[in-house]
Design a protein with these regions (language model features):
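Conserved N-terminal phosphate-binding loop of PLP-dependent enzymes in the Aspartate aminotransferase
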Residues: 1-348
Length: 348
């Protein structure tokens, strides 16, 4: 890969829509980021004790992510989302976790994946404590709190995907609305109020939105302060790193600051503080700031959506192919003659 293109064995170039499953946000083979990673490799890459690079990365993370007073690094998203669930259960003394039905993935661990249709090989009892509600429907979440009083440890959700966190009286199309972002009573604020009222933690999963919606996270765009938050994907332009951040009061339960206190085995991640990935993270943030990358996502994405939808309309296939979602992270939809989503059409 180079820039926005990937090449096959015949050296044919393809413009890459997915960009490393959205983990590559600056471009393939970026020399500055590669050099930053290489410099850490020749300095040892993975040390027994915490490195200065890890310290710098941690200081940078808590500086740019408003809700993060502490941070723990890992290698992939499932590690940190499951760690967040452990913290929530330990902090509240409760068992149940609520997640939106519409958001398809939070972890490959049994607590979540066992609650989906792809559950072969999981333990049923592990997912018995995972509850589902409807995104943008606060009443469906209120219903869970009534059914499970004082039993829900956390509500975990992505701040936005294709769907936007709208206000109750939003008149926009739910899959295209970008207008409710800064309104104080959008869905995320309703969730935050409800979790506080019930002594439940709010966990924002920013795997997709992080370092794409806003340098300081979608939590900044929507002016929301979660108890815990998780990041990954575009943190380091394709290098493997993820992060769990949050309030010190909660995060410290996974630390060793209080001798004799009962501890959480928060993560097992030998390579979690690998210096090459953390060096890439530091350089990626530097480039995002320097080159106004986030602004470019929004501006170029808007043009891309409009242009592709116009082409589809000109070809008279706009009922079967169209682009929707946020301008900084557009998604293309393919449908068959019956109007059903078609994955085989998507491969074309």
């Amino acid at each position: 890969g180079e820039g926005a293109y990937i090449f096959d064995l015949k050296d044919d170039a393809y413009l890459d829509y997915g960009m490393g499953l959205r983990s590559v946000n600056i471009g393939y083979g970026n020399r500055e980021i590669a050099d930053a990673a290489y410099n850490e490799i020749i300095n040892g890459n993975n040390l027994t004790r915490a490195s200065v690079t890890e310290l710098k990365a941690a200081e940078l993370f808590v500086d740019i992510i408003p809700s993060a007073e502490m941070v723990k690094f890992a290698k992939h998203g499932s590690t940190v989302t499951t760690a967040a669930i452990k913290l929530a259960r330990a902090y509240t003394g409760r068992k149940f976790i609520a997640v939106p039905i519409e958001q398809p993935f939070f972890s490959f661990d049994d607590w979540f994946i066992g609650s989906t249709v792809i559950k072969l090989g999981t333990l049923e009892e592990a997912s018995n404590y995972t509850l589902k509600f409807n995104y943008n429907n606060i009443d469906s979440l209120k219903k869970l709190f009534l059914e499970y009083p004082n039993q829900i440890a956390a509500v975990m959700l992505e701040p936005a995907t294709i769907q936007s966190p709208c206000t109750s009286n939003c008149t926009h199309e739910k899959n295209t609305c970008e207008g409710c972002s800064n309104i104080e009573n959008n869905f995320l604020h309703q969730v935050r109020e409800l979790t506080k009222l019930n002594g439940t933690l709010m966990i924002l999963d920013e795997m997709i939105t992080g370092f794409r919606w806003n340098l300081n996270g979608a939590q900044t765009k929507y002016n929301i302060v979660p108890d815990l938050c998780t990041f990954g994907k575009a943190m380091a332009n394709g290098f493997a790193v993820a992060a769990l951040g949050g309030k010190r009061e909660v995060m410290k339960l996974g630390g060793i600051e209080e001798p004799g206190a009962e501890r959480i085995f928060l993560t097992s991640t030998t390579h979690g503080a690998e210096m090459s990935a953390l060096g890439a993270f530091i350089k990626t943030v530097e480039i995002i700031k320097r080159d106004n990358i986030i602004e470019h996502y929004w501006n170029y994405g808007k043009q891309l959506k409009q242009g592709m939808n116009q082409i589809a309309k000109d070809l008279n296939i706009n009922d079967y192919f169209y682009v929707e979602g946020y301008s900084c992270s557009p998604t293309y939809i393919t449908k068959d003659k019956s109007g059903n989503v078609s994955m085989s059409f998507r491969t074309l």
